[in-house]
Amino acid sequence: MYKFLVFSSVLVLFFAQASCQRFIQPTFRPPPTQRPIIRTARQAGQEPLWLYQGDNVPRAPSTADHPILPSKIDDVQLDPNRRYVRSVTNPENNEASIEHSHHTVDTGLDQPIESHRNTRDLRFLYPRGKLPVPTPPPFNPKPIYIDMGNRYRRHASDDQEELRQYNEHFLIPRDIFQE
């Protein structure tokens, strides 16, 4: 019985190796993903409403409005009664400052906003707008005529006439041998 078990286990191993099958081992399966949390207005009652609180005062939110975060981390110290367009520290990021700034290179454009990198204007090269895309001419192949050599004849008499013409041109006449 012991020999049979050893023989059968070796046979199973050889069979699995010969058939190139891999036995699927249990692997790590990630935990199921949680659905997104959708909160209702009842759950967000204690948190500040950032955009409109009923007083209709046009001001930007600041960290002082937040109940948990301390107001000391607001190191920029923005005025809450003023709305800022882009950046307070760098006025070059604002489009209004670009319009009023003086460019060193005049590119000849009507609006200086279009020339952020002093690029060339190519409108004078292509006045019509879009250029037509060149396309190759249509491919119309010429028909090829093959001389079939009168392969398809209507009557058998045509073959006899051709054979008679062949004999006249290429065969030796009989009267030469009769002398």
Swiss-Prot record:
Triggers of expression: By bacterial infection.
Disordered as annotated region, ranges: 93-116
Positions annotated with a glycan in the UniProt record: T135
Record bears the keyword DNA repair: no
Keyword tRNA processing: no
Keyword field: Antibiotic, Antimicrobial, Glycoprotein, Immunity, Innate immunity, Secreted, Signal
Gene Ontology biological-process entries: defense response to bacterium; innate immune response
GO annotations of cellular component type: extracellular region
Bridged cysteine pairs (disulfide): none
Entry similarity comment: Belongs to the lebocin family.
UniProt name for this protein: Lebocin-1/2
